[in-house]
UniProtKB/Swiss-Prot annotation:
Family per record: Belongs to the SSRP1 family.
Name of protein: FACT complex subunit SSRP1-A
Low complexity: bias regions: 626-650
Tissue specificity: Expressed in the germline and somatic cells.
Length: 697
């Protein structure tokens, strides 16, 4: 058997059960979290002992390591024990011991530090155990030891502290203090050595943007201590899981970021990231108090005397102590020439860095979004013409709600779009944005000018791309009426203060400019001869008559399928309180699939009967023929002709008349007087719609 895989298994991580998949191979044990959180990799040679014991309310596997640490996995089945035992014995030469927990509920026993865990037991039977790495502090008070624990943001209920009462043995008062010995043993394995020992180096007056302040930093082999004016922090090296080094957008500063798990606390606020800010030209000499063994283990990266820019020396120091790689930006460059994109998140300004394997946002709140956690991305308000200079960038996560970054500069759109395509990240409802003159201009934005420019650009595109056969006159007239109604209905649009009506001047007297109606279409069809334009309009009118036929109300009802017959009869049974129409249809489809052929037979017979009924009625309908109506074509023809020259010409927004004018009919008369040439041409073509409209007036 090459490997074993167990999905749905969970691992204990600082009081939180992180679900994932456990894989056993010939040489190692690997656990990967479902949500990209906790991951465990252990080689077979590092395993000291395996125990089969309960974790929570299900069977679990305790993996003891040679260095005294342990990993606990749960969520197995009782039948998995034989599979794991045969696999570990054949590949790792390890047997599994079954360990039963003492579950009588007694609150007294022996508290001992075994390896890197605190085990509380009674008569050599374990009651519970606590990894020393979960301990944040130990306080000794006479005959009482208090353990304070790190907090995990993923856990809803967290253990804050635990107190052990260790009574003094009156017969052996000269023995060493049990509480003090217990404290030293826990601190040694928890990576919380006392500060009495000499630190590796001391960094003074370092600017920290998160949490805000200036701190003196003492770097120890297993921890770092931050001392500020108000707050002090002590961070174990093992809680640092990522290092980032990114430049600021101004090119003069650099951010050095430490990712922490578990985070540090300041009152009720938790900080999962430490962000240090350094000047790019700032230099400082460091003297490192390192032993020869520590220098050798750093592979030549560290020296006792280090000089250079402070951000470089500190990043190299943390890289060697934490044994982690430093993540730097990839090949992405924004419009500023740096990998930083300026934006806001929840009204807090910051910088977004597209990295090789995720997005880093600095700084409030700082976050790192891995590509594995992203479902899709969306560019919002990126196609709104030339009015806006910014757009919103949304990231949809597989687990959790979307993250929105607002007020990104328009120039970053295409660069970010190409970056996502290279990383094969799904983009929904977006496309590249064409650069326009208005977008690159530094002048003040004129909303009216921008709207007219955008409208003209759309009109030019439609004239160039479309052919005569694709043009539909009725649709064009209907669209212009809708545009007119929408522009009249809203009072907040910038066009309202400029819409004056093509037939009236600003004085409201009803006098119209004679050339105003002729100038707009002549600009659009400048190079087109007049006779050709008239023929084209005739062709457009003929093509405009084509459309979808109206449904005859006398036509027979179509046949219903077997599924619809059953669904309509069973709809009340399927519907429950609060169900929508879609929910009921979904339930019906699922139930229909599970039904047997015998159950469906009844409804299939009904469907056949309905089908034969439809065919019979359809023959009678075709034989008699559909009812004809002579009134509809003439009325439609008259209405089309009455639209006259004004409806066949595209009217810009600046020529749309206001519907609130009291003398709507008077401008129409004066318009016909102002353009007698066009009326004569229409009358020569046999159109008498204008005369009818004049008579009606």
């Amino acid at each position: 058997m090459a490997e074993l895989q167990f999905p749905g298994v969970y691992v204990e991580d600082v009081g939180h059960l992180a679900f994932g998949t456990l894989k056993l191979t010939e040489k190692s044990l690997n656990f990967k979290g479902d949500k990209g959180g906790k991951s465990v990799n252990v080689t077979g040679s590092d395993i000291d002992k395996l125990k089969w014991q309960k974790l929570g309310n299900k069977p679990g596997l305790r993996v003891g390591l040679n260095d005294g640490g342990a990993h606990r996995f749960g969520g197995f089945k009782d039948t998995d024990l034989e599979k794991i035992q045969s696999f570990t014995s054949s590949n790792w030469s390890q047997s599994i011991d079954q360990s039963n927990l003492f579950i009588k509920g007694w609150n007294y026993g022996q508290a001992e530090v075994k390896g890197k865990t605190v085990e509380f037991s009674w008569e050599d039977k374990p009651i519970f155990e606590i990894p020393c790495t979960n301990v944040s502090n130990v306080i000794a008070n006479k005959n009482e030891a208090v353990l304070e624990f790190h907090q995990n943001d993923d856990s809803k209920v967290q253990l804050m502290e635990m107190r052990f009462h260790m009574p003094i043995d009156l017969e052996n008062e000269e023995d060493a203090d049990k509480v003090e010995e217990f404290k030293k043993a826990v601190l040694a394995y928890a990576g919380l050595e006392a500060e009495t020992e000499q630190p590796i180096c001391l960094l003074t007056d370092i600017l920290c943007t998160t949490p805000r302040g200036r701190y003196d930093i003492k770097v120890y082999p297993t921890s770092i201590a931050l001392h500020g004016k108000t707050y002090d922090y002590k961070i174990p090296i093992k809680s640092i899981n990522r290092l980032f080094l990114v430049p600021h957008k101004d090119g003069r500063h650099v951010y050095f970021v430490l990712s922490l798990n578990p985070p540090i606390r300041q009152g009720q606020t938790r900080y999962s990231y430490l962000i240090f800010e350094f000047g790019k030209d700032e230099e400082q000499d460091l003297e490192l108090a390192l032993t020869d063994e520590q220098l050798e283990s750093s592979n030549g990266n560290l020296r006792r005397d280090m000089t250079g820019p402070i951000y470089e020396t500190i990043s190299i120091l943390f890289k060697s102590i934490c044994n982690l790689k430093i993540t730097v930006p990839g090949r992405f460059l924004g419009s500023s020439g740096t990998p930083a994109i300026q934006c806001t998140h929840r009204q807090n300004p910051g910088l977004l860095y597209p990295m090789e394997k995720g997005f880093l946002f600095i700084h409030k709140p700082a976050m790192y979004i891995r590509f594995e956690e992203i479902s899709s991305c969306h560019f919002a308000r990126s196609d709104s013409g030339t009015v806006t200079r910014t757009f919103d960038f949304e990231i949809d996560l597989k687990y959790g709600g979307p993250l929105t970054f607002n007020a990104m500069e328009k120039e970053e759109n295409n660069k970010l779009f190409d970056y996502l395509n290279k990383k094969n990240i799904k983009i929904r409802n977006s496309q590249r944005v064409e650069n326009t003159v208005a977008d690159s201009s530094d002048d003040e934005i004129d909303p009216y000018k921008a709207a007219v420019t955008a409208e003209g650009r759309q009109r030019d595109d439609s004239d160039d791309d479309s052919t005569d056969e694709d043009y539909d006159l009725d649709k064009d007239i209907k669209k212009k009426k809708e545009d007119k109604e929408s522009s009249e209905g809203t009072g907040s649009e910038p066009d309202d203060e400029y819409d004056s009506g093509s037939e009236q001047d600003s004085s409201g007297t009803g006098e119209s400019e004679p050339d105003s109606e002729q100038d707009v279409p002549s600009k659009r069809r400048k190079g087109e001869p007049k006779e050709k334009r008239e023929k084209k309009e005739k062709r457009e009118k003929k093509e405009g008559k084509k459309g979808k036929k109206d449904k005859d109300p006398n036509a027979p009802k179509r046949a219903t399928s077997a599924y619809m017959q059953w669904f309509l009869a069973s709809r009340n049974e399927l519907k429950e309180d609060g169900d929508s129409v879609a929910d009921v249809a979904k339930k019906g489809g699922a139930k229909w699939k599970t039904m047997s052929s015998d159950d469906k037979k009844k409804w299939e017979e009904k469907a056949e009967e309905d089908k034969s009924r439809y065919e019979k009625e359809m023959k009678e309908y075709r034989k008699n023929g559909p009812p004809s109506s002579s009134s509809k074509p003439s009325s439609s023809k008259t209405s089309k002709k009455s639209s006259g020259p004004s409806s066949s010409k595209a009217i810009s927004k600046e020529y749309i008349s206001d519907s609130d004018d009291s003398d709507d009919e008077e401008p129409k008369k004066k318009e016909k007087k102002a353009a007698p040439k066009e009326e004569s041409e229409e009358s020569n073509n046999g159109s008498d719609g204008s005369d009818e409209s004049d008579d009606s007036d």
